Design a protein with these regions (language model features):
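Membrane-interfacial terminal anchoring regions of lipid-handling membrane enzymes
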Residues: 1-19, 23-34, 104-107, 152, ...
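Short, basic, glycine/proline-bearing loop/turn elements
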Residues: 13-15, 83-89, 116-120
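Catalytic core of membrane glycerolipid acyltransferases/transacylases, capturing the structured
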Residues: 20, 33-94
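Hydrophobic/aromatic ligand-binding patch that stacks against planar heteroaromatic rings
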Residues: 56, 81, 104, 135-139
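Catalytic-site beta-strand/loop segments enriched in glycine and acidic/polar residues
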Residues: 105-133
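A cross-family acyltransferase "interaction/gating" segment
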Residues: 124-186, 220-221, 228-229
């Protein structure tokens, strides 16, 4: 498919990252297939997660098509850009339309980005996952790439005033080894494996993060931070 919008948007995003002076650490990019479909299953801690994960995938030579809620597509500014970059609109009132669209994109060799938690985790821990990532991988016969973003919550997240002037924040994006699920796999077992893998990756990323989590609003209670405790 033609990508006339994605390249200039990426250029603008890179300028924004440069303005913020973000210190990137991209790990495991080699796990993203250079061709063919794949599902990036990404944790969700802030409003910039999609742009950061998309940026981290660029060294693999891939543009990620994100599944995003309809409200973004309805926005007069963001909507045309989202459609121009061939992202996938998720309209909860339209049943399976978004799932079918994502399945079609995967079968045509696209990389799809999905946030299986559904919404931002205000505790910055990984919540229960929905089964969409596993079901898409099973249906299209493609791998799931567990993906962790850490640091984005320090810039802009839910229930906290955004700080786009914050400078030199370390940002980690880690891609894990691919998980494969055939069409006869147990969906619930697959979802459990995916969540356990993402939790393990998150803990490893946090352990190696250069800044201290102690006493920070952007850090989970488990690490001595003062973010809201998980509900479950």
């Amino acid at each position: 498919m033609a990508d006339l919008v994605y390249p200039p948007v990426i250029g603008a995003i890179k300028l924004f990252w440069k303005y913020l002076g973000l210190k990137f650490d991209f790990k495991g990019v080699e796990h993203i297939p250079r061709e063919g479909g794949a599902v990036l299953s990404i944790n969700h801690i802030g409003y910039l997660d999609f742009a950061l994960a998309g940026t981290a995938a660029l060294p693999a030579g891939r543009y990620v098509r994100f599944m995003a809620k309809k409200e973004i597509f309805d926005n007069k500014l963001a909507g045309p850009l989202m459609r121009g970059m061939h992202h996938i609109c998720v309209d909860r009132s339209s049943g399976t339309a978004s799932f079918v669209a994502a399945l079609r994109a995967l079968r045509s060799g696209e990389v799809i980005g999905i946030f299986p938690e559904g919404t931002i985790s205000v505790s910055f821990e990984i919540k229960e996952l929905k089964t969409g990532a596993v079901r898409l991988a099973m249906g299209a016969g493609v791998p799931v790439i567990p993906t962790i973003v850490w640091g984005s919550q320090r810039i802009w997240t839910k229930k906290v005033k955004r700080n786009l002037r914050r400078k030199k924040v370390p940002i980690t994006v880690a891609f894990g080894a691919p998980l494969y699920f055939d069409k006869n796999s147990d969906v619930e077992a697959g979802e459990k494996l995916l969540r356990e893998t993402m939790i393990s990756m998150l803990h490893e990323v946090q352990e190696k993060y250069p800044d201290s989590h102690q006493g920070q609003r952007w850090a989970p209670v488990r690490l001595g931070g003062i973010a809201p405790a998980p509900l479950n």
